[in-house]
Amino acid sequence: MKIVVIGSSNIDMIARVNHLPMPGETVGQARFMQAYGGKGANQAVAAARMGGEVTFVTALGNDMYANMLKEHYCKEGIVTDQIIIDNQNPTGTALILVAENAENCIAVAPGANGSLSTAHIEQISKTLEDAD
């Protein structure tokens, strides 16, 4: 099945903390990890893992995170030839705090995600027509 996913792509910067900080509070002893994220990216990866032939349409910055994400998508078997590189904005980033009780706070810096436009979508009309 040919699937086209159009959506966001982020690098998630995650800090696991004992509790979410109050305004002005610093919480120490955080455990940090970095992950691949974005609503569109998560859908593309899930569809590829289920056996779909997935083309992912997103916008990334011209930075090290873009290279990491494209490599990740390729390893997942996702077609990346429709990914747009935005030289004006960085790759999207999500800053996530997760408390021990699983509550979280998320701040998203959309970066290049905001540069994906209807003009880009019109340029891939053939890809969309060929999808199931």
Positions of PLM-derived features:
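Conserved N-terminal subdomain of the carbohydrate kinase-like
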Residues: 26, 49-131
